[in-house]
Amino acid sequence: MQTNVVSAQEWEAARQNLLLKEKALTHARDAMAAERRRMPWLAVEKNYEFDTPKGKASLRDLFEGRHQLIVYRAFYEPGVFGWPDHACRGCSMVADQVAHVAHLNARDTTLAFVSRAPQADIARQKARMGWEMIPWYTITDSFDADFDVGEWHGTNVFFRDGDKIFRTYFINSRGDEQMGGTWNYLDITPLGRQEVWEDSPAGYPQTPTYKWWNWHDSYVEGAAPDKRWVEVSDAGEAAFRNKQAGAKP
């Protein structure tokens, strides 16, 4: 494996040079966030209904009285790899990394996950995986299709002004990585995520993208990726890419 061992002075000089670029990236990210806050809003005209542990609820109810609502579409339902014992591996990783929601609530913001699994299955899965803190509801209508998450994970953001609800933001695919600490932590290590798409020095370990993902209670050190998961992951990625390509003008 290629390495470059230098003196303390040379190391500090390299770190300072990288720090300048990191600060520029931070400023660019701040500018992007400012632009995001100025995005136009889209009025939500339809009424949507969800199953919850307490019965039926509207989209407005999901705000829990707050003004902002973040909705992550997690794939846990019949037909998903791992069902009914597990949710999608990627969605499970996102759920594992949700911070204490009190911090979001303190900023007038509610986080919710939605899937098509029945509430009984969601409750069992939350208890087993330690996700009790995440409000997780069942989609009962066209909510997922209407908000671009019918076939792929994604995050929608809504704002409530009285009884009026607006869609203010949407992101999916790799954009959802910013909601997960695992990827950010790995990005500051010398080996990175160790996936084949990364630009790393020759000889650094790399494996097929996403294939190492697993449920947090199912990792086996040194074990090869599950063949069925590889097939499902590849098929899902291909379908998503083809759909994206077909949508381009």
Model-derived regions, located:
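Non-globular targeting/processing and membrane-anchoring segments
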Residues: 1-107, 124-128, 141-249
